[in-house]
């Protein structure tokens, strides 16, 4: 792909494909717990284990699937990922009376996502100059976020007809798999980093962006996971759904607008803006009414637009590995942060809920938004200043 043209026909097709993949996935994801409970006849603790393993497959395997994509080729990897998505959708469709097929469908879609994400994001920036990367990364994120915003709406319209929903989603996945067969295979560039053995899939890790990404998602996912529960009885379901759609649409509109400015911004400054907005949003939630929740979600959307983009750009700039491997490593960081959010955040939420002081939960999360980033920066600087034992010997 030409280095000087950011939005070629191939890249536009990729962006459209990502939009549709996310519409399909997020028309299913919000309703998975209900679906699994109905088909498996299990309690929510068991359902939580199944969903947790699915999340682990999707995120913890990302460095391995990224290393595989580096060897297999990005176009082939995208086709393979979409075939896995299609098989997962088919398993959901035919597994109404077979819980094992339903669980297999979950794992196939999780595995497909693990392979698709680094391949898609790497293909978008393949052959692009460093000056074009911010626009392409932000456009890729925007397409995904638009799909995330629209997917639950599609799911809500079709959830009463699950067979139809799974048939539509499977048809979308299969059509995309066929379309990606005609995608141009990427050519290896002269300045491409060497392909390293699988055992070195984590070598060349950009440590600071990895750590900041993990912390970002640790605090961010507490908003994403627990606000719906907090909002029950405080605001209407329609208002909450519209507000969360506004969050995703805010990312879609804002991130491409600020991409070049974020790229030029110093990392600590971007962290201050991003985590600062997250803290403001968490504090706003303590108001517990429609205005407070809307303001909080808007602040978090603005902060996320800056912080999440800067994390990826810094990882690309600081690592000597290929973009495919870097995006896989970053996806692992997302999984680490999200898992910590589920464990730590869930216990904290339960503690405050049991004590009848639920707004205090958001103050604790806001305090972490303020305290954790400078702690991460401080530890990173100390590590850089620490003498190397090999040098002193």
Question: Over which residues does each language-model region extend?
Answer:
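A membrane-interface helix-boundary motif in multi-pass transporters
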Residues: 159-171, 349-369
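Structural signature of the two symmetry-related core transmembrane helices
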Residues: 76-90, 269-283
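A late C-terminal transmembrane helix in Major Facilitator Superfamily
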Residues: 324-354
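Cytoplasmic helix-loop-helix junction between adjacent transmembrane helices
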Residues: 106-144
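Helix-to-loop junctions at the C-terminal end of transmembrane segments
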Residues: 61-73, 159, 253-267, 349
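Helix-loop boundary and gating motifs at the non-cytosolic
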Residues: 5-55, 206-212, 216-243
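C-terminal membrane-cytosol helix-exit motif in multi-pass small-molecule transporters
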Residues: 171-189, 375-379
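Juxtamembrane intracellular "pre-TM" segments in multi-pass secondary transporters
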Residues: 1-8, 184-212
């Amino acid at each position: 792909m030409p280095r000087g043209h950011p939005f070629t026909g191939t890249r536009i097709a990729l962006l459209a494909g990502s939009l549709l993949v996310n519409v399909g996935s997020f028309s299913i994801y919000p309703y998975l717990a209900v679906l699994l409970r109905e088909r498996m006849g299990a309690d929510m603790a068991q359902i939580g284990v199944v969903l947790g393993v699915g999340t682990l497959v999707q995120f913890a395997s990302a460095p391995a699937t990224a290393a595989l994509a580096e060897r297999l080729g990005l176009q082939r990897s995208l086709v393979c990922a979409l075939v896995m998505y299609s098989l997962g959708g088919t398993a959901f469709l035919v597994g109404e009376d077979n819980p094992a097929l339903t669980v297999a469908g979950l794992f196939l879609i999780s595995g497909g996502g693990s392979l698709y994400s680094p391949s898609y994001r790497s293909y978008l920036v393949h052959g692009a100059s460093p000056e074009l990367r911010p626009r392409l990364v932000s456009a890729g994120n925007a397409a995904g976020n638009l799909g995330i915003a629209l997917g639950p709406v599609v799911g809500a319209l079709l959830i009463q007809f699950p067979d139809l929903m799974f048939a539509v989603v499977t048809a979308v996945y299969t059509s995309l798999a066929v379309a990606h067969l005609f995608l141009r295979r990427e050519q290896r560039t002269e300045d491409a980093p060497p392909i390293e053995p699988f055992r070195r899939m984590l070598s060349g890790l950009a440590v600071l962006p990895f750590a900041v990404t993990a912390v970002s998602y640790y605090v961010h996912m507490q908003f994403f996971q627990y606000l719906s529960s907090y909002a029950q009885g405080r605001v209407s379901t329609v208002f909450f759904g519209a507000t969360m759609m506004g969050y995703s649409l805010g990312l879609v509109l804002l991130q491409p607008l600020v991409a070049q400015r974020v790229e030029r911004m110093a990392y600590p400054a971007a962290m201050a803006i991003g985590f600062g907005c997250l803290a403001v949003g968490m504090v706003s939630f303590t108001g517990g009414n429609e205005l407070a929740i809307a303001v909080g979600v808007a602040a978090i959307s603005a902060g996320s637009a800056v912080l999440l983009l800067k994390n990826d750009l810094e990882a690309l700039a600081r690592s000597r590995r290929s973009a495919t491997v870097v995006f896989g490593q970053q996806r692992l960081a997302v999984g680490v942060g999200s898992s910590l959010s589920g464990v730590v955040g869930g216990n904290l939420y339960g503690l405050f809920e049991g004590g009848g002081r639920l707004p205090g939960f958001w103050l604790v999360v806001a305090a972490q938004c303020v305290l954790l980033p400078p702690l991460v920066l401080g530890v990173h600087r100390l590590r850089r200043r620490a003498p190397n034992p090999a040098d002193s010997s």
